[in-house]
């Protein structure tokens, strides 16, 4: 008898807003490259009597933008106020976390329901193994996105998060996967037995969420198979062991003793505020994908690859603008941005931003190929050197330095063709017998002899004249 197994998963995703100052004070939000406990003040370390400033307006703008791009209904008919969420942990100096009521709710992204979007403050960083706490992070604005339990497999959850992180890159002012933390809620139904919901806290990567779900499915299935009962509990992800470990029974809202924060005035999201934020919203990745296909006539797969990296998509459009928006220009842009540049970036495990290249570098390279200063084969070599050297030299500088210009000396090219013909008797015989493709082998010999500096079209013409007489 085969197993009848299904799962439901919902996520609570926390992502930092990249603002200059914290949510309720003027302290800087930089905490990674500074000495511990330096970017702090009485507000963000919870000193008694310290009063918070009004919430960071920029953080609110970004939260509104996120809610709108997740197709949420905006809360405009009642006040947005902050609550105190009480719990005791060393990284929470005041004993409570300030968290807003929903800014937007009842949204949908890629078929997954969005329960709500709200703002809250990040706690500090506690290191249990050292017994130390760094409060530089305390008070940094966080956006929390709570989904409905609509994901039916680890693969669905992984793809949802990938697309969400891509959306965040387009929005900007969000610190993305490097600071993302997700609380993963999962329940399974095994052969008609419904297990209780289990929450796994603070999973800090997309890969981690995927591994948690795979592990929990197996763990919960084995419990139900043996006739046991799934406890409603909170678990921790032990990343080094790729397992989850029980922390405590699952909390309810009552456990956190939510109360409105008396030190903060309610905020009203009026239509003019929302309309202003909407006017500043960028094009979404999905919209850009469709536009690239319709406007430039490229394949859907090519569009997806380009749009997966916002900077790469921008370079693609810059190339078309400078090289030409006709069929030739678009073809060159696809070949050299989507295919060759992307190939080298993937090989080096970096994105365009990390390469330090400029759009002008790619345009200069393509123009060098277009005007036959270099061959396409040499173009591939140049783009590899450009990425290796972090954009320190322009294509023209590299072409000159490496001696990669197309051979213009006819006698040098003639000599290479003669030698290739001499070494390709079988290919020449096949070509003369009507196998036109056999000539490609001879062309390849010439390209090898000239180290790619010959222009293929010129080589073909010269070979045909010599062979055909």
Curated annotation (Swiss-Prot):
GO terms, molecular function: asparaginyl-tRNA synthase (glutamine-hydrolyzing) activity; ATP binding; glutaminyl-tRNA synthase (glutamine-hydrolyzing) activity
Pfam family, one: GatB_N
UniProt keyword Nucleotide-binding, yes or no: yes
Gene3D superfamilies in the record: 1.10.10.410, GatB domain, N-terminal subdomain (1.10.150.380)
Entry superkingdom: Archaea
Top enzyme category: ligase
Signal peptide residue numbers: none
Keyword line: ATP-binding, Ligase, Nucleotide-binding, Protein biosynthesis
Biological process per Gene Ontology, one example term: glutaminyl-tRNAGln biosynthesis via transamidation
Function noted in UniProt: Allows the formation of correctly charged Asn-tRNA(Asn) or Gln-tRNA(Gln) through the transamidation of misacylated Asp-tRNA(Asn) or Glu-tRNA(Gln) in organisms which lack either or both of asparaginyl-tRNA or glutaminyl-tRNA synthetases. The reaction takes place in the presence of glutamine and ATP through an activated phospho-Asp-tRNA(Asn) or phospho-Glu-tRNA(Gln).
Oligomer status and interactors: Heterotrimer of A, B and C subunits.
Record family assignment: Belongs to the GatB/GatE family. GatB subfamily.
UniProt name for this protein: Aspartyl/glutamyl-tRNA(Asn/Gln) amidotransferase subunit B
Species: Methanococcus vannielii (strain ATCC 35089 / DSM 1224 / JCM 13029 / OCM 148 / SB)
Lineage: Archaea, Methanobacteriati, Methanobacteriota, Methanomada group, Methanococci
